[in-house]
Amino acid sequence: MHARQRNVGNGYRSGSIGMGMSGSRISPERPMRGHGFYGSEHQHRGFNRGYGRGRGRSKSYHNQLPPPLPPPPVQRRSSGGDVFMEAGRLATEYLVSQGVLPQTVLSSKWQNGNFRKQAGEFQSSRSQEEARMDVSAPAAEKRRYIDGYSSAGSRNSLKGRRSHRYDSDFGRSGSWSERSKAFETETGDDSVSGHQEEQPLAEDIASSVQRSASGEFMRKCEGAGDSESVLDKYNLQDEAQSKTGSSSAGKDIVQDCEISKVSEGSSSLSAGSGEMKGRSGGNGGEDENQTAIEDGSIHQRCEDASIDQQCGADESFTKSGIDLATLCKFEKVPTRTRSSLTAKGPKLYLSHNIKDTSHNSGLEEEDQTENRCETRGQSSGKADSTGDENDQVEDFALVQYIENSKCHRSNSFPSSILRDNSEKESGLELPNLHRSHSVGKVGEKRPGEGSDLEEGSKRQRDWVAVSEANERFNMFKTSGNQCDPEEEGKTSSFNKRLIDGAAGKRVSHESLVNNSTYNRTHTGRTGPGYAEEHQLFPASFKMCDLNLGGASDVNDGIKESRQAVDFDLSISSSSKSLEFGTSTRMSNGKEIEVINLDDDQEVVKSSNDPGRKQEAAPYMGIDDVPDYNERLMMVEYLDSFTPINQGTSSVPQNNNTVSLQDREGAIGNDQVPNNTDDDSIFMSLGEIPLTFLQAWDQPPARGYEKPF
């Protein structure tokens, strides 16, 4: 299919030798392949290329052929002026018919852009192309056919499709190299490859200029009349603009660059602005009427003509410090965070509000205009094909104001980002500061309310209070020798009340510890002080003290049910005392012992008494087992290994008197009880005995020898 568009060996086109115009000028659309077209194409290949490139070659091979010589540009230059004159004449007629602007004001680039898109939309279907072929003059067809196959048809249909694909993606953002690369990827299609090989460079430049000049407005222009003049202009305008450098393309490039420079840090905003401009112009160009085209051209001209002035005015407003909030009349108020902060914490927000008054006003204006612009952009983006000319005429002032705000937004974008961040941080931090301030006040009130609790807890950590407790409770030391059992019960109930109280938990226990220590050291084991010790301390301590005194067992059983409530408190507090810090037998709260090492020695001395052992026997089941019992258990455990010691001692004796066989037998006899002892140990530990392993290893070895 591509051979129609290539030079043959003698330098002529295939269509000019003998192919009919109706057969060779069929549009390169895919649905036309099956209508007898492939046969005629193959016939031309075989006729013109007799050296064997016709039948067996694929399209990929034809794409790899070297590009043909470019056509002589003299023919295009001779008629290029006529096309521009015709385009200017049509544009002038439109303007005069409307009477909006004079002939000299309207720039030629919008005329060219409108007619380009009009031609692209006109060539998007096969029926329109066939109608164009019927209207075309034979001389024009001859010239266009020699210059390139369907230079108006394939080229315009290509640009019509490409404008739909890439204009919305690029907008006014993206470099020229990216656009040209995207166009080169587009030219891989079957309907484009031949023409792209003829003029790749001119097509790339012209397509990029055409895309930047026309923008989004070309998407909606559809014109059915004046097709031949439009196509003549559009066919010859690409190379004319690429070689002569027309003022329209140059101005558009300059303005496009200015927009990109103004929006350095906000390419997305500038792209959105470009798309909005294209859409605002394209909404009025949907109808096929001339008035719609005129309105679109007016919008485009006015926006591009005044964009630099608007940017300059915005810069002057920004630099001069004029409050833009006074110029806008919106009903919106600042966000809820700002208003709530002014109501809740006026003192905290006052200084910050004085500093950021200008920032707040600028941000309010920017946020409100951004909301309006986003609303307008969404309406024009979603309903891109539903706008009419009346909306454009009514909203022309709004479009200008939107462009003004967009330019201001993109110009002051970096500073506005900083201000937005500062406002967001202030809006997020100020409520937190207010809350933390209130929490601080609550925290200040709490020490006033519960100061006694904190002082009591701090005294427990600061061990200076122990000496104070010793001095404070000297009365208990002296009264312990003189008080009656009734007074002892009163003191115990008093201490119990102190333990139950929130403020006196630690102090009362320290007093008890010191008092009991004094009673043990001074009054002996059997006396009123010792009885007081048993009454003051809980039952868990008395179980340990039975080994020493064993005097008041009945009182212990009576007091155990009463003071069981304070067991955990006394244990947790006593574990932190200095006296118990020297004890080496504190594994957990239940195993705390009041007995010192010196007391244990006395227990060992008195352990020969059988009656004492019987008294200690009922308490063997509890974790706190006396040391002498543990020693006896260790001795019995060591006595169980006596055969091992005897065996090791008997081995060297047998070495001197017994022969090797007897010695081996003796060793074997020694191993037998050793194995039995090891078996008993391993079975107690839950492991497998060694003798069982020895018997286990032998039978499987015999069994494994059989298959191998």
UniProtKB/Swiss-Prot annotation:
Residues 1-79, 119-301, 349-390, 410-461 are annotated as: Disordered. Residues 238-249, 410-419 have a biased composition (Polar residues). Residues 442-461 have a biased composition (Basic and acidic residues). Residues 260-274 have a biased composition (Low complexity). Coiled coil: none annotated. PANTHER family: PROTEIN, PUTATIVE-RELATED (PTHR36056:SF1). It comes from Arabidopsis thaliana. Residues 65-74 have a biased composition (Pro residues). InterPro entries: At4g26450-like. This is Uncharacterized protein At4g26450. Transmembrane segments: none annotated.
